[in-house]
Design a protein with these regions (language model features):
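Active-site neighborhoods of divalent-metal-dependent phosphate/nucleic-acid chemistry enzymes
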Residues: 45-51, 69-121
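A short, glycine- and basic residue-enriched loop/turn
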Residues: 1, 32, 103-104, 123
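Short secondary-structure boundary segments
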Residues: 37, 122-123
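Beta-alpha-beta core module
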Residues: 128-131
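A generic structural signal for short hydrophobic patches within well-formed alpha-helices
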Residues: 9, 40-43, 83, 126
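Short amphipathic alpha-helical segments and helix-helix/interface helices
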Residues: 22-26, 108, 123
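Short, well-structured N-terminal submotif of metal-dependent ribonuclease cores
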Residues: 1-39, 47-66
């Protein structure tokens, strides 16, 4: 299982996504790729924050009709076990003086709960969290 971080999905939604990201995703088995509910929320927020217009509508369609359905049965929730993992991740990061955002800690907690890997374009926070 590999969780795709929000920045990977954002990259795939660009008009001209990074060839290396597209190539990497294409080499993976679809059944091994997952999203978290946090990524859904972050993508939807990013789109909702745009001014109303064609770009916002196009991104909404691209996500809701294109990307989102591809993961319909592969979306991981934040549950009670993830809340335990979240608390540990944040506490350990604080003790070490490492910055770990709420969003990264929430996604990291889901990753830990399901014992999977994370694919991200920003490895720093996740490496610092021991993922």
């Amino acid at each position: 299982m590999i969780v795709l971080d929000t920045n990977v999905i954002s990259e795939l939604m660009r008009a001209q996504p990074s060839p290396s990201v597209v190539s990497w995703v294409d080499r993976q088995l679809d059944s091994t790729l997952y999203l978290t509910v946090l990524t859904l929320a972050e993508i939807r927020f990013g789109i909702a924050a745009l001014p109303k217009g064609r770009r916002r509508m196009a991104l909404t369609r691209a996500f809701e009709d294109g990307i989102r359905p591809l993961f319909s049965d592969r979306i991981l929730d934040f549950d009670e076990q993830a809340s335990i993992e979240y608390a540990e991740l944040r506490a350990n990061a604080r003790r070490r003086g490492v910055a770990l955002s709420d969003a990264d800690a929430l996604i990291g907690a889901i990753v830990r709960t399901h014992r999977c890997k994370i694919a991200t374009r920003d490895e720093g926070p996740f490496k610092a969290a021991g993922l």
